[in-house]
Amino acid sequence: MFHTRNSSQNTAEFVLLDQLVEEDHLLRKIDKHIDFSFIIEKVKPYYSENKGRPSLDPLILFKMMFIGYLYGIRSERQLEKEIYYNMAYRWFLGLNINDPVPHHSTISWNRRTRFKDTTIFQDIFDEIVLQGINHDMVGGRVLFTDSTHLKANANKHKYTRKTIAQDTQNYIKDLNEAIQEDREEHGKKPLTAKEEVKAEKEIRHSTTDPESGYLYRENKPEGFFYLDHRTTDMKYNIITDAYVTSGNVHDSVPYLDRLDHQIARFGFQVEAVALDSGYLTAPICKGLSDRQIFGVIAHRRYHPIRGLFPKWKFHYDSEQDRYICPNHQTLTYSTTDRKGYRSYKSNPEICSSCPLLENCTKSKNRQKVITRHVWEDHKEKVRQNRLSVSGKNLYKKRKEKIERSFADSKQLHGLRYCRLRGKRNVSEQVLLTAACQNMKKIATYLAKQG
């Protein structure tokens, strides 16, 4: 039967705020299973003990931030409004129905002033990971790492051309030692020391956000971006590391340092890692071997010169330290250069009469040259790992773990775009997003356990 209701909006009711929040609400689970008491001790050094007016409770301040990242609320002004109307948010913050909501400028002032140049956001992220470890949700044995791009708050057409010095990689000292040892083994004189000249490169320097980097990769959007280099654990896909670089930094550059950071910070006993093809470099393969870690890295596609034999057509004979060409002739060792590459050269007299010459080389002296890195053995070991049964199973898990983590960040938590400008602000966004994802996962799991 059709019915209408005449309701009045000015009736007085006696209600408990707790009754307005569902029993299975996410914020109830987080409030019950996540211990936020550590925040008080972490932020105490940044407050005065006896000067000024009483501050906003730091727990309320950070819980407001958590709400914003949990529910993808990008604006602090909008966050203030959402808390004003949402009873679950008020309950989580410990605010009564009639209590005023802290002003949005309080959040921004604390971020820009009180917590500027501090490690508070990294500390919060680390503490949440440690809680996951305490609940046996992080194994620390098998890790997945990848990077994703965040669109910088910058116009890609507003930039200047700038020449910068390229940073020296951390592995250079080890590489130089390996080069000298390799030359000695082959009876070559040690390379003379040369004055270090830093290589330079020209980049597009954003005038809007100078710390962002111009991303130009195959199958990727073009423009100014930041990169979130993330690691997740095999067990429950808890994020164990989140590190920000500008968009023009190669994925492989920060990897080993961040791996060591996790091992030192959380005491991980890492046994295996699965990585994308961007990490298939000789230094990373060597680093994994030195750490006795089973590395599985995706195959990187190479594009050989059309009409010429690809490198894999030439077989390396490790016992004789030589290459065998498709016509069963040998390429012998020649030298090892400063970049760590050995050169193997064919006999031009034999090559001149070879029926496969046109498919082998276009050099005027009719000599084929193949290079091999001094750490290539470690790279080949990683390739063998990828083709093994355990390697194939492990790599299948990669897309289910790290890719899923990135998808949740972008679709549910607003990590597709940078909210603010500058590496420090983007790092804050990335760390708090990752921390909130971990909170949600830990709380949901523990709630199911009862």
Locate predicted features:
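Short, solvent-exposed coil/turn linker segments
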Residues: 16, 34-35, 94, 310
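Basic, short loop/linker segments at the boundary and entry of helix-turn-helix/winged-helix-like folds
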Residues: 23-66
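Hydrophobic alpha-helical membrane-insertion signals
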Residues: 1-28
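Anion-binding and metal-coordination hotspots
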Residues: 3-6, 65, 72-85, 95-450
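Generic alpha-helical segment signature
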Residues: 10, 23, 36, 57, ...
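Short amphipathic alpha-helical interface patches used for protein-protein assembly/oligomerization
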Residues: 89-93
